[in-house]
C-alpha cells in the first residue's frame, strides 16, 4: 500500500510530513511526500512559514506520480501552487483526497489568508473527506456563508475534538467517542488524518477507518514524547494482534524463568487494548498458570480477548488513573517479600475488610490502592479475607514489562528461601 502526504515540513518532527511518514510506517504503509512549506517551529512558537516555489512543487508532483500509482492523498499545510497542482492531478488520476485543513498552529500562528481559504474551498469540493477540528470547522462554515460559497453536499466532514462527528449532507451520521487526556500534544491532527488515509488504503470502509485511526491517535497521545516545551506525537499502533503477540512473548519469558510465585488459585496474565471499555478489550489466558508436582508449572489455556473478567477489572480500574498501564499478573503473596519489594518498587494495598457491599472487589480495591498511592503503583496487594487467598498483583505498560518485573520479584523472593 502507498499513500501520498502533502504538507509542511516541521524540523522537530512533531507534525507535518515527518509525522505523516512515521504514522504511515507504523501502520505498514509506504508514504512518499510532497513538501509545500518549511515551517521552523516547536511547542513554543512558529518562527516562520517559508513556501516553496511553484516550479519546485510541480517537480515534486511529477517525480512522485512517475514513480508510484497513487489512489489516496492526505494533505496538511497547503499553498496556492500546491492546491492548483493537486486539483489537476485529482482530475487526471481520480484521487481520493483526505484534507486536513491546517488553518493555524497550536501556538496560534495563522497559515491561511482569505485568498488561500477560497482555494481550500475549491479543494474541499474535490475531496473525499475533510478533517477540521471543531474550531476550524466553525471558521470554514462562517467563511462559506460570508462569501456566498458552496461545498458539495456529499462531501464527508469529520469535525474532530474529544468526540468526533462524521457528517454528510451537513448532517451527523456517526459520533466517535474519545477520552480527555491531560496533555497538549503537537501533531495529533496530522497523525489522525494520515492514519485514516492509511486504513482507507488498506480497504477499510470509512467508519471503520476512522474508528481504528481514533484508537491509534489516542495511543499516540498517551505515549507522546516529552520535550522542553511540551509533547510531540508518537505514532503508536496497539491492536489485538499486537496485544496477543505481547502476551505470547511474555509467557515465553515466563517459561524460561524458575517461576515459583504461583498462588493456590493459580496465576493469570492479561493485557488490554488502549483505553479499554470492558473486559472484552482485555486478553488473558482462558485457563491459568498452575503448579505441578515437580516444582514447576503448567500454562493452561489459550490467549483470548474476554477470557478473564477478574483480572480485567484490575486493568480497567488502573487505566482510569494512568492509560499507559494496560497489563497485570497475579502472583503469590508473602509478607516478608512485600517488605523487601518496597525498596525496589512502588507498592500500595487495600483491605478487604473495608470493602463496601455490592461492589466489584477488584475494581474497588484497585481504585483504593491507586488513590492511596496517587497513581498506579507497580504492585497492589491485599492480605486476603474469609475464603479469599492473599494476593500480589503486578502492573505495567504491557505484559512483557509485567513479566520482567515478576522476574525481579522472583529473584528477591529467592533470597528469602
Curated annotation (Swiss-Prot):
Any GO MF annotation of the entry: phosphomethylpyrimidine kinase activity
A GO CC term attached to the entry: cytosol
Keywords: ATP-binding, Kinase, Multifunctional enzyme, Nucleotide-binding, Thiamine biosynthesis, Transferase
Region annotation (Thiamine-phosphate synthase) ranges: 236-417
Keyword Nucleotide-binding: yes
Positions of region (Hydroxymethylpyrimidine/phosphomethylpyrimidine kinase): 1-235
Keyword Protease set for record: no
Amino acids binding 4-amino-5-hydroxymethyl-2-methylpyrimidine: 41
One BP term from GO: thiamine diphosphate biosynthetic process
Name this protein carries in UniProt: Bifunctional thiamine biosynthesis protein ThiDN
Organism: Methanocaldococcus jannaschii (strain ATCC 43067 / DSM 2661 / JAL-1 / JCM 10045 / NBRC 100440)
The encoding gene: thiDN
Amino acid at each position: 500500500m502507498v499513500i501520498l502526504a502533502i504538507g509542511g515540513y516541521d524540523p522537530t518532527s512533531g507534525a507535518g510530513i515527518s509525522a505523516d511518514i512515521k504514522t504511515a510506517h507504523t501502520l505498514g504503509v509506504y508514504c512518499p511526500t510532497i513538501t509545500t512549506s518549511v515551517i521552523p517551529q516547536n511547542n513554543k512558537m512558529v518562527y516562520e512559514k517559508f513556501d516553496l516555489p511553484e516550479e519546485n512543487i510541480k517537480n515534486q508532483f511529477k517525480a512522485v506520480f512517475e514513480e508510484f500509482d497513487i489512489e489516496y492523498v492526505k494533505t496538511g499545510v497547503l499553498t496556492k501552487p500546491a492546491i492548483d497542482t493537486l486539483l489537476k492531478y485529482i482530475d487526471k488520476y481520480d484521487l481520493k483526497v483526505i484534507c486536513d485543513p491546517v488553518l493555524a498552529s497550536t501556538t496560534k500562528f495563522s497559515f491561511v489568508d482569505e485568498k488561500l481559504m477560497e482555494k481550500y474551498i475549491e479543494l474541499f469540493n474535490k475531496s473525499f473527506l475533510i478533517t477540521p477540528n471543531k474550531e476550524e470547522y466553525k471558521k470554514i462554515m462562517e467563511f462559506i456563508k460570508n462569501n456566498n460559497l458552496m461545498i458539495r453536499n456529499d462531501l464527508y466532514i469529520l469535525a474532530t475534538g474529544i468526540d468526533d462527528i462524521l457528517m454528510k449532507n451537513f448532517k451527523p451520521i456517526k459520533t466517535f467517542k474519545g477520552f480527555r487526556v491531560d496533555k497538549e500534544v503537537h501533531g495529533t491532527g496530522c497523525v489522525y488524518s494520515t492514519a485514516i488515509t492509511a486504513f482507507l488504503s488498506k480497504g477499510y470502509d470509512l467508519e471503520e477507518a476512522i474508528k481504528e485511526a481514533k484508537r491509534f491517535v489516542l495511543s499516540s497521545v498517551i505515549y507522546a514524547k516529552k520535550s522542553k516545551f511540551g509533547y510531540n506525537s508518537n505514532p503508536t499502533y496497539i491492536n489485538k494482534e499486537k496485544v496477543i503477540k505481547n502476551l505470547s512473548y511474555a509467557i515465553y519469558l515466563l517459561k524460561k524463568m524458575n517461576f515459583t510465585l504461583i498462588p493456590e488459585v493459580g496465576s493469570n496474565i492479561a493485557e488490554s487494548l488502549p483505553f479499554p471499555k470492558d473486559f472484552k478489550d482485555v486478553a488473558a489466558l482462558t485457563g491459568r498458570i498452575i503448579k505441578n508436582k515437580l516444582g514447576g508449572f503448567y500454562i493452561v489455556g489459550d490467549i483470548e480477548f474476554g477470557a478473564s473478567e477478574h483480572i480485567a477489572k484490575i486493568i480497567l480500574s488502573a487505566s482510569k488513573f494512568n492509560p499507559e498501564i494496560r497489563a497485570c499478573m497475579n502472583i503469590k503473596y508473602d509478607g516478608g517479600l512485600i517488605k523487601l519489594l518496597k525498596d525496589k518498587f512502588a507498592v500500595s494495598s487495600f483491605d478487604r475488610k473495608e470493602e463496601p457491599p455490592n461492589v466489584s472487589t477488584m475494581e474497588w480495591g484497585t481504585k483504593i490502592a491507586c488513590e492511596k498511592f496517587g497513581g498506579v503503583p507497580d504492585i497492589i496487594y491485599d492480605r486476603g479475607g474469609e475464603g479469599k487467598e492473599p494476593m500480589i498483583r503486578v502492573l505495567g505498560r504491557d505484559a512483557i514489562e509485567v513479566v520482567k518485573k515478576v522476574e525481579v520479584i522472583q529473584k528477591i523472593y529467592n533470597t528469602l528461601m
